Amino acid sequence: MILDKVNSPEDLKRLSLEELLLLAEEIRSEIIRVTAQNGGHLASSLGAVELVLALHRVFDSPRDRILFDVGHQAYAHKLVTGRKDRFHTLRKEGGISGFTKVSESPHDAITAGHASTSLANALGMVLARDLMGEDYHVVAVIGDGALTGGMALAALNKIGELQKRMLIVLNDNEMSISENVGALNKYFKELQIRKWVQDAEKLGKNILERISPQLFGLVDRAKEAAKFLLHQENPFYAWGIRYVGPVDGHDLKGLVHILEHLKALDGPTLLHVVTKKGKGYKVAEADPIYWHGPPGFDPKKPEKVSKGYTWSQAFGDAVTELAHMEPRLFVLTPAMREGSGLVRYSLEHPERYLDVGICEDVAVTTAAGLALRGMKPIVAIYSTFLQRAYDQVIHDVAIENLPVVFAIDRAGIVGADGATHHGVFDIAYLRTVPNLQIAAPKDALELRAMLKKALEVGGPVAIRYPRDNVERAPEGVWPEIAWGKWEVLKEGTEAYILAFGKTLRYALEAAGDDPRVGVVNARFLKPLDREMLRELSRYKLLTVEDHQKMGGFGSAVLEALNEMGLKPEVQILGLPDRFFEHGAIPSLHRQAGIDAEGIRKALAAMGVALVHERA
């Protein structure tokens, strides 16, 4: 295999074009093989193989800095930069990351995971390069979905102004995770249509030149005038950025030729490359949304694998039903229709649904505008992405106490996506915001109760739930819930475990049937149930949460006890002050000591040794 001979990008420069083409197919096979075992971002990486090979053929990594926005498309990059022997560990605990990571390889120019960051990073690098008198190339590879993000557009504005030498490669596959939305995406599609027209034009030009040179001259002058107008309306020219394209992102020879030419140019240049998401794997080409990030599968007989009924689906089903009951309900999402379980809702209530693209801040402030005019908006968003709209949560929603509901998906440890995606900071940054209430349901039925009640209580409410399966709740059932009140699930005589969110099941498992240990579903963090907390202060208390210990649920409990002048023995279980890498969720919980075994050990340290500990 040719891949066996490739240990660094330098080895690509010694291969013939024919060998590079064969290497592209070998890389695709390896990506399919490993993602079939481990899961991962399959379709994006398959679509970028030729582009990655061309970039490493022309540029000199790691001296030249090649940045991959988000990192979904970087698997080929990992394979040709000295990590092929570890590629089988992709996204596994102790293995290589599914994204680019500075600490993993000198060839990874940035640590990525969130969208739209590459251009600002690249701008910083070219500024540093020029100020330090160094000479290297900076190339930012960004998808058409990520380019719609406000951070990317703001960086383009500054890149055009400063006119520093850098190359932006727009990898246009018409997708992010869901289908792309917005005016810029429509423009990219129009450019692709124009490319088809240009190809037809070339054929007509050859025929016309032979038939009538005079007529050809007239048509050619008209074409030049049209080209001028096209450039005038091209947004990249308006930014002061040279635009080249669109070009075929799977024409390896053509890509190498174009990149060699662009490498010599001064100022900022954008190369528009059109690729096919899932290229070379029929099922991924046919359904790039599902195969964007599939779980494990059989590569010889690839079929969609049911992930079971998830919290995301439970949320989607609940809001779909609620929208039939509440005509003012409106749901927004930042490019996560499928991930947030909103396909059904978007089909049944298209007029009250908005995908704003990868613009979390826009989602939150648009929700504020809706609320100001009498609507009841719900922002469906992952915990890790809500942090990108923190200012809007405070400035646009909370200050005026607007009735916006934040449905926070993927709260807590999320597994194989690692440090950039764990939702373990939202409690800390949200509970400091006045007016904002925070809750976490124990099951899908309680989620339904909280969503319905949240639309009635007034003011902003955050409801957080994990990346996990959950038992389906019956349709049409909307139980009442005592807002702000906790729920005792098991009585105890010596100690109580106060569990918030997903850790409740660990608490019940740890307590078992031991009569000394009680368990509380502490489902409301803000407001805390101070009445119950006062009653429980006669016992030893152990708080448990799938969140950073600092500033989390346990901290809120201690603050409340202090304000009430109560001093029971309290221990807090949560994530320690460090970033957790990728791995299986149960394993990461075990590392953090918030699983059932960790709870039993903490209780034993408090003098309540359970049967498990005594044995």
Curated annotation (Swiss-Prot):
Keyword Transferase among UniProt keywords: yes
GO MF term (any one): magnesium ion binding
Domain of life where this protein originates: Bacteria
SMART domains reported for this sequence: Transket_pyr (SM00861)
Endoplasmic reticulum is among the record's keywords: no
Single GO BP term: thiamine biosynthetic process
EC number annotated for this UniProt entry: 2.2.1.7
Binding site for thiamine diphosphate: H72, G113, H114, A115, G145, A146, N173, Y281, E360
Catalytic activities: D-glyceraldehyde 3-phosphate + pyruvate + H(+) = 1-deoxy-D-xylulose 5-phosphate + CO2
Pathway: Metabolic intermediate biosynthesis; 1-deoxy-D-xylulose 5-phosphate biosynthesis; 1-deoxy-D-xylulose 5-phosphate from D-glyceraldehyde 3-phosphate and pyruvate: step 1/1
Cellular component annotations (GO), alphabetically ordered: cytosol
Family, per entry: Belongs to the transketolase family. DXPS subfamily.
NCBIfam families in UniProt: dxs, PRK05444.2-2
Protein name per its UniProtKB record: 1-deoxy-D-xylulose-5-phosphate synthase
Organism lineage string: Bacteria, Thermotogati, Deinococcota, Deinococci, Thermales
Gene field: dxs
